[in-house]
Amino acid sequence: MSDLGSEELEEEGENDIGEYEGGRNEAGERHGRGRARLPNGDTYEGSYEFGKRHGQGIYKFKNGARYIGEYVRNKKHGQGTFIYPDGSRYEGEWANDLRHGHGVYYYINNDTYTGEWFAHQRHGQGTYLYAETGSKYVGTWVNGQQEGTAELIHLNHRYQGKFLNKNPVGPGKYVFDVGCEQHGEYRLTDMERGEEEEEEELVTVVPKWKATQITELALWTPTLPKKPTSTDGPGQDAPGAESAGEPGEEAQALLEGFEGEMDMRPGDEDADVLREESREYDQEEFRYDMDEGNINSEEEETRQSDLQD
Protein backbone atom coordinates (compact mmCIF):
# COMPACT_ATOMS: atom_id res chain seq x y z
CA MET A 1 0.00 0.00 0.00
CA SER A 2 1.02 3.60 -0.51
CA ASP A 3 1.01 4.72 3.08
CA LEU A 4 4.61 5.88 2.76
CA GLY A 5 3.18 8.59 0.58
CA SER A 6 4.07 10.94 -2.16
CA GLU A 7 7.70 11.44 -1.25
CA GLU A 8 8.29 8.71 -3.82
CA LEU A 9 6.43 10.78 -6.41
CA GLU A 10 8.36 14.01 -6.75
CA GLU A 11 6.86 16.75 -8.82
CA GLU A 12 8.88 18.38 -11.56
CA GLY A 13 10.21 21.80 -10.65
CA GLU A 14 9.18 24.83 -12.65
CA ASN A 15 12.79 25.44 -13.66
CA ASP A 16 12.23 22.64 -16.16
CA ILE A 17 10.15 24.74 -18.50
CA GLY A 18 8.58 22.21 -20.83
CA GLU A 19 5.46 23.42 -22.62
CA TYR A 20 3.25 26.11 -21.11
CA GLU A 21 0.04 27.85 -22.05
CA GLY A 22 -1.42 30.52 -19.82
CA GLY A 23 -0.97 33.85 -18.13
CA ARG A 24 2.28 35.63 -17.38
CA ASN A 25 3.22 38.73 -15.43
CA GLU A 26 5.29 41.69 -16.60
CA ALA A 27 8.48 39.82 -15.72
CA GLY A 28 7.49 36.97 -18.02
CA GLU A 29 6.86 34.57 -15.15
CA ARG A 30 3.95 32.16 -15.15
CA HIS A 31 1.20 33.97 -13.35
CA GLY A 32 -2.55 33.33 -13.15
CA ARG A 33 -4.23 30.34 -14.78
CA GLY A 34 -2.10 28.07 -16.90
CA ARG A 35 -1.41 24.60 -18.24
CA ALA A 36 2.03 22.99 -18.37
CA ARG A 37 3.45 19.78 -19.78
CA LEU A 38 6.75 19.09 -18.07
CA PRO A 39 9.78 17.37 -19.63
CA ASN A 40 9.29 14.23 -17.50
CA GLY A 41 5.77 13.69 -18.87
CA ASP A 42 3.86 15.09 -15.87
CA THR A 43 1.21 17.76 -16.39
CA TYR A 44 -0.13 20.59 -14.26
CA GLU A 45 -3.21 22.71 -14.75
CA GLY A 46 -4.15 25.42 -12.30
CA SER A 47 -3.03 28.64 -10.69
CA TYR A 48 0.45 30.17 -10.80
CA GLU A 49 1.98 33.04 -8.91
CA PHE A 50 5.37 34.51 -9.78
CA GLY A 51 6.42 31.41 -11.67
CA LYS A 52 5.34 28.85 -9.08
CA ARG A 53 2.31 26.63 -8.59
CA HIS A 54 0.20 28.57 -6.13
CA GLY A 55 -3.51 28.17 -5.37
CA GLN A 56 -5.82 25.46 -6.71
CA GLY A 57 -4.40 23.01 -9.21
CA ILE A 58 -4.29 19.48 -10.59
CA TYR A 59 -0.94 17.75 -10.95
CA LYS A 60 -0.93 14.47 -12.92
CA PHE A 61 2.03 12.12 -12.80
CA LYS A 62 2.87 10.05 -15.85
CA ASN A 63 2.48 6.86 -13.75
CA GLY A 64 -1.21 7.61 -13.13
CA ALA A 65 -0.99 9.27 -9.72
CA ARG A 66 -2.49 12.73 -9.31
CA TYR A 67 -2.94 15.49 -6.77
CA ILE A 68 -5.99 17.74 -6.71
CA GLY A 69 -5.84 20.59 -4.24
CA GLU A 70 -4.06 23.63 -2.93
CA TYR A 71 -0.47 24.72 -3.54
CA VAL A 72 1.73 27.29 -1.85
CA ARG A 73 4.94 28.16 -3.74
CA ASN A 74 5.17 24.80 -5.53
CA LYS A 75 4.36 22.79 -2.38
CA LYS A 76 1.18 20.87 -1.60
CA HIS A 77 -0.22 22.94 1.23
CA GLY A 78 -3.78 23.19 2.55
CA GLN A 79 -6.63 20.90 1.54
CA GLY A 80 -5.95 18.31 -1.13
CA THR A 81 -6.54 14.79 -2.42
CA PHE A 82 -3.70 12.56 -3.55
CA ILE A 83 -4.56 9.44 -5.57
CA TYR A 84 -1.71 6.93 -5.72
CA PRO A 85 -0.87 4.59 -8.62
CA ASP A 86 -2.27 1.55 -6.76
CA GLY A 87 -5.66 3.26 -6.29
CA SER A 88 -5.29 4.18 -2.63
CA ARG A 89 -5.89 7.82 -1.81
CA TYR A 90 -5.52 10.46 0.88
CA GLU A 91 -8.03 13.25 1.43
CA GLY A 92 -7.16 15.94 3.92
CA GLU A 93 -4.70 18.56 5.02
CA TRP A 94 -1.17 19.07 3.71
CA ALA A 95 1.78 21.14 4.89
CA ASN A 96 5.02 21.65 2.99
CA ASP A 97 4.33 18.72 0.64
CA LEU A 98 3.50 16.32 3.52
CA ARG A 99 0.30 14.87 4.94
CA HIS A 100 -0.14 17.02 8.02
CA GLY A 101 -3.23 17.83 10.06
CA HIS A 102 -6.50 15.93 9.75
CA GLY A 103 -7.15 13.52 6.92
CA VAL A 104 -8.58 10.22 5.70
CA TYR A 105 -6.52 7.53 3.99
CA TYR A 106 -8.34 4.91 1.89
CA TYR A 107 -6.26 1.77 1.39
CA ILE A 108 -6.53 -0.62 -1.54
CA ASN A 109 -7.82 -3.42 0.74
CA ASN A 110 -10.69 -1.09 1.75
CA ASP A 111 -9.22 -0.35 5.19
CA THR A 112 -9.46 3.30 6.22
CA TYR A 113 -7.66 5.59 8.63
CA THR A 114 -9.39 8.75 9.82
CA GLY A 115 -7.57 11.10 12.12
CA GLU A 116 -4.51 13.21 12.74
CA TRP A 117 -1.30 13.25 10.72
CA PHE A 118 2.10 14.71 11.48
CA ALA A 119 4.97 14.96 8.99
CA HIS A 120 3.40 12.38 6.64
CA GLN A 121 2.65 9.79 9.36
CA ARG A 122 -0.40 8.82 11.41
CA HIS A 123 0.21 10.68 14.64
CA GLY A 124 -2.22 11.77 17.35
CA GLN A 125 -5.81 10.61 17.68
CA GLY A 126 -7.16 8.40 14.92
CA THR A 127 -9.44 5.52 13.96
CA TYR A 128 -8.31 2.60 11.78
CA LEU A 129 -11.11 0.46 10.35
CA TYR A 130 -10.29 -3.11 9.26
CA ALA A 131 -12.65 -3.72 6.35
CA GLU A 132 -12.34 -7.52 6.29
CA THR A 133 -13.40 -8.06 9.90
CA GLY A 134 -15.25 -4.85 10.75
CA SER A 135 -12.97 -4.30 13.75
CA LYS A 136 -11.55 -0.87 14.44
CA TYR A 137 -8.78 0.68 16.51
CA VAL A 138 -9.78 3.96 18.15
CA GLY A 139 -7.04 5.78 20.00
CA THR A 140 -3.54 7.19 19.95
CA TRP A 141 -0.88 6.88 17.24
CA VAL A 142 2.81 7.74 17.47
CA ASN A 143 4.96 7.98 14.33
CA GLY A 144 2.63 5.73 12.35
CA GLN A 145 2.25 3.05 15.05
CA GLN A 146 -0.61 2.17 17.39
CA GLU A 147 0.70 3.45 20.70
CA GLY A 148 -0.94 4.80 23.84
CA THR A 149 -4.43 4.51 25.30
CA ALA A 150 -6.93 3.03 22.86
CA GLU A 151 -9.98 0.86 22.31
CA LEU A 152 -10.02 -2.09 19.89
CA ILE A 153 -13.64 -2.74 18.94
CA HIS A 154 -14.86 -6.07 17.55
CA LEU A 155 -18.29 -7.37 16.56
CA ASN A 156 -19.54 -8.36 20.02
CA HIS A 157 -16.77 -7.30 22.36
CA ARG A 158 -14.02 -4.74 22.72
CA TYR A 159 -10.62 -4.37 24.38
CA GLN A 160 -9.72 -1.23 26.32
CA GLY A 161 -6.17 -0.56 27.44
CA LYS A 162 -2.78 0.64 26.33
CA PHE A 163 -0.77 -0.25 23.21
CA LEU A 164 2.92 -0.15 22.37
CA ASN A 165 4.31 -0.85 18.88
CA LYS A 166 0.89 -2.16 17.76
CA ASN A 167 0.70 -4.62 20.69
CA PRO A 168 -1.46 -4.37 23.82
CA VAL A 169 0.58 -3.96 27.00
CA GLY A 170 -0.12 -3.75 30.71
CA PRO A 171 -3.51 -3.68 32.43
CA GLY A 172 -6.73 -3.54 30.46
CA LYS A 173 -10.10 -5.17 30.08
CA TYR A 174 -12.37 -6.95 27.61
CA VAL A 175 -15.94 -5.67 27.52
CA PHE A 176 -18.56 -8.13 26.25
CA ASP A 177 -21.96 -7.19 24.86
CA VAL A 178 -23.68 -9.81 27.03
CA GLY A 179 -23.08 -7.57 30.02
CA CYS A 180 -19.75 -8.29 31.72
CA GLU A 181 -16.12 -7.24 31.73
CA GLN A 182 -12.98 -9.34 32.03
CA HIS A 183 -10.08 -7.52 33.70
CA GLY A 184 -6.46 -8.53 33.42
CA GLU A 185 -3.18 -7.55 31.85
CA TYR A 186 -1.02 -8.26 28.82
CA ARG A 187 2.52 -9.43 29.45
CA LEU A 188 5.16 -9.47 26.74
CA THR A 189 6.87 -12.86 26.59
CA ASP A 190 9.34 -14.53 24.26
CA MET A 191 7.65 -16.71 21.68
CA GLU A 192 8.48 -20.41 21.84
CA ARG A 193 10.84 -21.37 19.03
CA GLY A 194 11.39 -24.69 17.31
CA GLU A 195 14.72 -26.44 16.88
CA GLU A 196 15.23 -24.91 13.44
CA GLU A 197 15.01 -21.45 14.99
CA GLU A 198 17.41 -21.98 17.88
CA GLU A 199 20.36 -20.34 16.14
CA GLU A 200 18.45 -17.21 15.18
CA GLU A 201 19.46 -14.15 17.17
CA LEU A 202 16.14 -12.34 16.81
CA VAL A 203 13.59 -13.13 19.49
CA THR A 204 9.92 -12.55 18.74
CA VAL A 205 7.98 -11.07 21.64
CA VAL A 206 4.26 -11.75 21.82
CA PRO A 207 1.66 -10.40 24.24
CA LYS A 208 -0.04 -12.91 26.55
CA TRP A 209 -3.28 -12.14 28.34
CA LYS A 210 -3.68 -13.00 32.02
CA ALA A 211 -7.25 -12.64 33.29
CA THR A 212 -7.79 -11.68 36.92
CA GLN A 213 -11.40 -10.66 37.48
CA ILE A 214 -14.91 -10.59 36.01
CA THR A 215 -17.19 -7.65 36.81
CA GLU A 216 -20.34 -5.97 35.61
CA LEU A 217 -20.16 -3.29 32.94
CA ALA A 218 -18.55 0.03 33.87
CA LEU A 219 -18.33 3.33 32.01
CA TRP A 220 -15.32 3.50 29.67
CA THR A 221 -13.12 6.57 29.84
CA PRO A 222 -10.06 7.02 27.58
CA THR A 223 -7.55 6.64 30.40
CA LEU A 224 -5.29 3.75 31.27
CA PRO A 225 -7.27 1.30 33.40
CA LYS A 226 -5.83 0.58 36.82
CA LYS A 227 -4.94 -2.97 37.71
CA PRO A 228 -7.76 -4.40 39.87
CA THR A 229 -6.73 -5.00 43.48
CA SER A 230 -8.43 -7.17 46.06
CA THR A 231 -9.34 -6.06 49.59
CA ASP A 232 -9.41 -8.09 52.75
CA GLY A 233 -12.23 -6.26 54.50
CA PRO A 234 -15.78 -7.49 53.85
CA GLY A 235 -18.49 -5.18 52.65
CA GLN A 236 -16.21 -2.90 50.59
CA ASP A 237 -17.51 -2.36 47.08
CA ALA A 238 -15.10 -2.19 44.17
CA PRO A 239 -16.06 -0.14 41.08
CA GLY A 240 -18.18 -2.25 38.74
CA ALA A 241 -18.05 -5.34 40.96
CA GLU A 242 -20.43 -6.90 43.48
CA SER A 243 -17.64 -7.10 46.05
CA ALA A 244 -13.89 -6.67 45.99
CA GLY A 245 -13.08 -9.70 48.15
CA GLU A 246 -14.63 -12.72 46.45
CA PRO A 247 -16.16 -12.49 42.96
CA GLY A 248 -19.81 -13.38 42.46
CA GLU A 249 -20.98 -16.79 41.31
CA GLU A 250 -20.75 -15.84 37.63
CA ALA A 251 -17.28 -14.33 38.01
CA GLN A 252 -16.05 -17.33 39.98
CA ALA A 253 -17.35 -19.72 37.33
CA LEU A 254 -15.57 -17.75 34.61
CA LEU A 255 -12.30 -17.46 36.47
CA GLU A 256 -12.14 -21.19 37.17
CA GLY A 257 -11.71 -21.84 33.45
CA PHE A 258 -8.68 -19.67 32.75
CA GLU A 259 -6.16 -19.86 35.58
CA GLY A 260 -2.79 -18.76 34.22
CA GLU A 261 -1.81 -17.07 30.99
CA MET A 262 -3.55 -17.27 27.62
CA ASP A 263 -2.38 -16.27 24.15
CA MET A 264 -4.86 -13.59 23.18
CA ARG A 265 -4.26 -11.00 20.49
CA PRO A 266 -6.87 -8.23 20.24
CA GLY A 267 -6.33 -8.04 16.48
CA ASP A 268 -7.18 -11.71 15.86
CA GLU A 269 -10.85 -12.14 15.22
CA ASP A 270 -11.07 -15.79 16.29
CA ALA A 271 -8.85 -15.65 19.35
CA ASP A 272 -11.04 -14.02 21.95
CA VAL A 273 -14.63 -14.08 20.74
CA LEU A 274 -17.50 -14.43 23.19
CA ARG A 275 -20.25 -16.34 21.40
CA GLU A 276 -23.88 -15.80 22.27
CA GLU A 277 -25.30 -19.31 22.02
CA SER A 278 -28.88 -18.25 22.62
CA ARG A 279 -30.91 -15.17 23.41
CA GLU A 280 -32.69 -17.16 26.11
CA TYR A 281 -29.92 -17.00 28.69
CA ASP A 282 -31.82 -19.11 31.22
CA GLN A 283 -31.71 -22.13 28.89
CA GLU A 284 -28.14 -22.00 27.58
CA GLU A 285 -24.67 -22.04 29.10
CA PHE A 286 -21.58 -20.07 28.13
CA ARG A 287 -18.37 -22.03 28.58
CA TYR A 288 -14.72 -21.13 28.20
CA ASP A 289 -12.87 -23.34 25.70
CA MET A 290 -9.14 -23.50 26.35
CA ASP A 291 -8.36 -24.39 22.73
CA GLU A 292 -10.60 -21.91 20.96
CA GLY A 293 -10.20 -19.06 23.44
CA ASN A 294 -13.91 -18.38 23.94
CA ILE A 295 -14.62 -16.70 27.25
CA ASN A 296 -18.17 -17.48 28.38
CA SER A 297 -20.29 -17.32 31.56
CA GLU A 298 -21.52 -20.47 33.30
CA GLU A 299 -25.08 -19.43 34.01
CA GLU A 300 -26.38 -16.14 32.57
CA GLU A 301 -29.59 -16.73 34.52
CA THR A 302 -27.63 -16.43 37.76
CA ARG A 303 -26.16 -13.13 36.60
CA GLN A 304 -29.54 -11.77 35.64
CA SER A 305 -31.03 -12.67 39.04
CA ASP A 306 -28.06 -11.09 40.82
CA LEU A 307 -28.55 -7.89 38.87
CA GLN A 308 -32.25 -7.79 39.75
CA ASP A 309 -31.48 -8.24 43.45
Swiss-Prot record:
Region described as Disordered: 1-42, 222-309
Tissue expression pattern: Expressed in trachea, lungs, airway brushings, and testes.
Ranges of Basic and acidic residues composition bias in the record: 21-31, 262-290
Superkingdom in the source lineage: Eukaryota
Keyword set, alphabetical order: Cell projection, Chromosome, Ciliopathy, Cilium, Cytoplasm, Cytoskeleton, Disease variant, Flagellum, Meiosis, Primary ciliary dyskinesia, Repeat
A Gene Ontology BP annotation from the UniProt entry: axoneme assembly
GO CC, one annotated term: cytosol
SUPFAM superfamilies (alphabetical): Histone H3 K4-specific methyltransferase SET7/9 N-terminal domain (SSF82185)
Subcellular location: Cytoplasm; Chromosome; Cytoplasm, Cytoskeleton, Cilium axoneme; Cytoplasm, Cytoskeleton, Flagellum axoneme
Assembly and interaction partners: Component of the axonemal radial spoke 1 (RS1) and 2 (RS2) complexes, at least composed of spoke head proteins RSPH1, RSPH3, RSPH9 and the cilia-specific component RSPH4A or sperm-specific component RSPH6A, spoke stalk proteins RSPH14, DNAJB13, DYDC1, ROPN1L and NME5, and the RS1 complex-specific anchor protein IQUB. Interacts with RSPH3B. Interacts with RSPH4A. Interacts with RSPH6A.
The name this protein goes by in its record: Radial spoke head 1 homolog
Species whose genome carries this gene: Homo sapiens
Taxon lineage: Eukaryota, Metazoa, Chordata, Craniata, Vertebrata
